[in-house]
Design a protein with these regions (language model features):
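Long, hydrophobic, well-ordered secondary-structure blocks that form the structural core
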Residues: 113-191
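Amphipathic alpha-helix face/heptad-repeat signature
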Residues: 126-129, 156, 221-225, 251, ...
Length: 328
């Protein structure tokens, strides 16, 4: 009589066994974590017709951006929660060291009043812009089809919160030296009404309602964030250096270091998606829709930057070259 076979237990992390090597810390804590993808017909393994399930089925599962195995994506930097905190603790110490050193030197008191007026208009309202980018990254984290993508969105969200808090901190400092320029009081009005910001406001507000996960990724990481980085960080930082604001230049350089990491995982995800036939057209169609909004936002903002001839074209060229480097 044949004896029933004894089932052997699966090895720990059996989903990574195909690689035939001990999985890395990154792979162990980052891969295949989305339980909401186990049953595509019923995300979260609850009523398939409840609003949240319908939302994920429409905006994630039915996205025209397809791949047979999104869980195969890997962050090229292999960032995990532990290493992210180690990395950014050092970066925050650097930034707040800048704040302390320049404050001790009386940096703000030495700024030209005319330049401070530009900061009140073109820098301080940026916290509204950064908050919109933060919300967009948080949505991408929630809606992405793989945990390795969601993790990248999570760290990007946290980085953008850093930018926002840096801006808020500097706004408060500048209000101490220039109490007649409305620092800390007039930013919302400028964000909602100043011509310099209306292109970016249109871009990010529309991006926040691009609910398909793939289109959200394109609008945010391929258009909005590069436009902000090239104009509101790089070009403004260069204008600051031209006007004796060394602190602003160093601060934007530190923020652009975060942006470089975002760009690496963005490029890796684009190249991963392009492995699937048809995704090139999907991405191209979305870029045709969103890239003009990004260029218009750059033009509107850079038109008001002082001492910055050619800033708008340089920023647009930077965005276009970035997308070309991804194969788009």
């Amino acid at each position: 009589m044949t004896q029933p076979a004894v089932l052997q237990p699966l090895k720990t992390w059996s989903h990574l066994a195909a690689r035939r090597r001990k999985p890395s810390e990154y792979e162990i804590v980052s891969t295949n974590l989305h339980y909401s993808t186990d049953r595509p017909d019923a995300p979260f393994e609850l009523d398939p017709n409840m609003p949240m399930a319908l939302w994920f089925k429409q905006n994630r599962n039915a996205s025209p951006l397809k791949h047979a195995d999104w869980n195969g994506f890997r962050d090229p930097d292999e960032i995990i929660y532990r290493t992210y905190n180690m990395l950014q603790d050092g970066h925050e110490n650097y930034v707040y060291g800048l704040f302390d050193q320049f404050s001790a030197r009386g940096h703000d008191a030495m700024l030209d009043h005319g330049w401070a007026r530009h900061l009140a208009r073109l820098y301080a309202p940026g916290r509204y812009l950064f908050h919109a980018l933060q919300m967009g990254s948080a949505y991408l984290c929630q809606i992405a089809p793989a945990s390795t993508i969601s993790n990248c969105g999570t760290y990007q969200t946290a980085d953008t919160l850093r930018w926002l808090t840096h801006t808020a901190y500097r706004t408060r400092e500048l209000s101490n030296s220039f109490d007649d320029l409305g620092f800390g009081a007039g930013e919302r009005d400028k964000w909602e009404n100043d011509p310099a910001w209306q292109g970016f406001r249109e871009l990010v507000e529309k991006a926040l309602v691009a609910y398909d996960w793939g289109e959200s990724f394109v609008a945010l990481n391929l258009v909005a964030r590069p436009a902000v980085e090239e104009a509101v960080l790089r070009a403004l930082g260069q204008a600051g250096r031209h006007n004796g604001d060394t602190l602003l230049g160093l601060l934007t350089d530190a923020q652009l270091a975060d942006a470089d990491r975002h760009r690496r995982w963005t490029g890796a995800l684009v190249k991963f998606a392009l492995q699937t036939e048809g995704n090139d057209k999907v991405l191209a169609d979305w870029l045709a829709k969103w890239a003009p909004l990004g260029d218009a936002a750059i033009d509107a903002y850079c038109a008001h930057l002082p001492d910055s001839p050619g800033a708008a074209q340089a920023a647009k060229d930077g965005c276009a070259e970035l997308r070309r480097s991804y194969g788009l």
